[in-house]
A protein has these predicted regions:
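Intrinsically disordered, low-complexity Ser/Thr/Pro/Gly-rich interaction regions
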Residues: 1-112, 121-137, 147-150, 158, ...
Length: 188
């Protein structure tokens, strides 16, 4: 029996879930934060209703929010990891031209993305940045990055293992050119 007028909690399930923890960073949007994310994979699909949840990492509370799960996988976010920072510095932003016949205008950008880990253990960090978008076939774009990103769904993704109390660096260059008489948006 359930008493009227009082909230009651029911345990829906109990179990150990396989999860890979990664810090997700998107420095091109102006932030230096890395967000702790668990990629949860369940042995079978479930369909649980929305409800309040409290989240903890290593036994420490990191936040509260609404939880729901439908399917056999979910990406769960646990808030910002203050011990992992990402700094995207623009080293070069210039325009110019090249060629005598069929002259083209050029744009060059170069960034250094530095990921710093203050944890005493190595951490997995996923850095994401939008792939340059070409709006006209006359525009040519070349991306050079070390390490090279994985490109999927117009997103450049770098999966790094950042050493304990250490740093990892991404060198990222975009070179673009277009016909001299074309309106060419500079971008960021």
């Amino acid at each position: 029996t359930v008493p009227a007028g009082r909230p009651v909690l029911f345990e829906l399930a109990r179990g150990d879930w396989k999860a890979s923890f990664v810090r997700l960073a998107r420095p091109g949007y102006g932030g230096k934060a890395a967000w702790l994310m668990a990629e949860v994979r369940l042995p079978e699909a479930v369909d649980w209703p929305h409800g309040p949840a409290q989240y903890s990492v290593d036994g420490l509370p990191v936040g509260a929010g609404t939880f729901a799960l439908s399917g056999d996988h979910e990406d769960m976010f646990f808030g910002r990891d203050s011990r992992v920072t990402v700094d995207m510095k623009q080293d070069l932003r210039q325009s110019g031209s090249k060629g005598f016949v069929g002259k083209r205008q050029t744009r060059d950008w170069k960034w250094t993305i530095e990921v710093t880990n203050s944890h005493t253990q190595p951490v997995a960090v996923r850095v994401e940045d939008p792939e340059p978008q070409i709006g006209d076939s006359a525009i040519e774009v070349k991306v050079v990055a070390k390490p090279a990103p994985v490109v999927k769904d117009h997103v450049n993704t770098w999966n790094l293992t950042v050493p304990a109390s250490g740093k990892s660096v991404i060198d990222y260059t975009v070179e673009a050119s277009a016909p001299e008489d074309m309106h060419f948006i500079y971008g960021r």
